[in-house]
């Protein structure tokens, strides 16, 4: 689905410094727009034979871990909303559990809300993603059918 120019801006927010910078910089450029601050959380994977071992007491721990991840995702999204509002955007949180790759979830949410554009930092929280253009941002760039803004942080933390 192609983007609607009047749709909200979709800010992808995971709490990383890159995501914070993206909201601050892009929010300043696009102030007064309606924005959704999306936090995608991933469920705890049930690995290998453990998932089929019948150890239901341990599976309850996975449910608790997923519940905690969902709650944490909500807090992260709320933090992103506060940043977006501070940058002049009319923002609301969206928190969702990934049913597959995070980039697919981002595109699905952008489509379902007819987002005018997707805005994200270049790298996320993981050490591996800091080595490259983040795999999520790279996949979104290549698969999104709407404008996508990837905001890079200055290499010198003191530079603006």
Which residues does each predicted region cover?
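Structural beta-alpha unit
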Residues: 1-4, 79-118, 156-160
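Short, solvent-exposed amphipathic alpha-helices that sit
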Residues: 25, 72-80, 105
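General small-molecule cofactor/ligand-binding pocket signal
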Residues: 36-38, 92-96, 149
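Small/aliphatic-rich secondary-structure junction motif
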Residues: 2-60, 89
């Amino acid at each position: 689905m192609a983007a609607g120019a009047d749709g909200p801006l979709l800010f992808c927010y995971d709490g990383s410094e890159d995501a914070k910078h993206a909201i601050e910089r892009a929010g300043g450029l696009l102030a007064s727009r309606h924005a959704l601050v999306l936090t995608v959380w991933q469920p705890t994977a049930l690995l290998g034979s453990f998932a089929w071992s019948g150890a239901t007491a341990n599976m309850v721990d996975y449910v608790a871990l997923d519940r905690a991840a969902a709650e944490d995702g909500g807090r992260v999204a709320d933090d992103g909303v506060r940043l977006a509002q501070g940058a002049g955007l009319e923002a609301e949180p969206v928190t969702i559990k990934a049913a597959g790759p995070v980039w697919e979830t981002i595109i699905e949410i952008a489509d379902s809300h007819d987002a005018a554009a997707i805005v994200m930092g270049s790298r996320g929280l993981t050490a591996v993603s800091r080595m490259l253009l983040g795999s999520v941002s790279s996949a979104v760039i290549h698969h999104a059918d709407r404008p996508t803004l990837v905001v890079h942080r200055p290499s010198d933390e003191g530079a603006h």
